[in-house]
Regions:
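Extreme N-terminus of proteins, especially the signal/transit-peptide cleavage junction
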Residues: 1-7
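Acidic/histidine-rich alpha-helical segments that form the ligand environment
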Residues: 82-118, 125-139
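Short Lys/Arg-rich basic patches
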Residues: 8-12
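Short, contiguous alpha-helical
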Residues: 2, 13-28, 33-78, 119-176
Length: 176
């Protein structure tokens, strides 16, 4: 496989561990359990439910689907949860899962990116599974940031003092 295959793996890992996860940590730090579990209505998700959903998705698609671990996901439970688990506990759970998935992705031989896999009820390649998780994580990270902003106001994820946005979150280095 070409260098682009390795670059895809490297960039996927970087986005999950060095971009999305630290932003979720920064955005949710200091929120109360009530903030974390607040819902606009019963059809909407709370920050807590979104974090559980990301945890379940990453575990099912990467750790199980690509890494071979048992699939123990209870997807509906991610949305039904109402126990008001503290934000720090939720983040620790999500962070542990993302770092476990990072080890799985890091171990992938780039020449296997086009190999077939079946995850949930979908037939796809290894590359498509990684791409799907990264895209899905990005979408829900944005939702978490929006909900956190409702409670905290400016999340201060960027230093704007130089005229060019510079990430302030741990690991943030990419330009936006």
């Amino acid at each position: 496989m070409s260098d682009i295959s390795q670059a895809f793996i490297d960039q996927s890992r970087k986005l999950l561990t060095d971009s999305y996860l630290p932003r979720i940590e920064a955005a949710t730090h200091g929120l109360t359990a009530e903030n974390i579990w607040w819902r606009a209505n019963e059809e909407s998700n709370s920050i807590g439910n979104l974090m559980l959903h990301l945890d379940g998705n990453v575990r099912q698609w990467i750790i199980s689907g690509l890494g071979g671990a048992a699939d123990v996901r209870r997807r509906q439970g991610e949305f039904d949860e109402r126990t008001k688990m503290p934000g720090a506990e939720l983040f620790a759970k999500l962070s542990g899962t993302v770092h476990e998935a990072d080890r799985v992705i890091a171990a992938i031989d780039p020449s296997t990116l086009l190999e077939p896999r079946r995850i949930q009820s979908y037939d796809m390649t290894v590359m498509r599974a990684i791409y799907t998780v990264v895209e899905h994580f990005s979408m829900h990270t944005g939702q978490i940031l929006l909900l956190a902003k409702m409670w905290k106001g400016d999340l201060a994820l960027y230093d704007l003092s130089s005229g060019n946005p510079r990430p302030t979150w741990k690991g943030g280095r990419e330009g936006h």
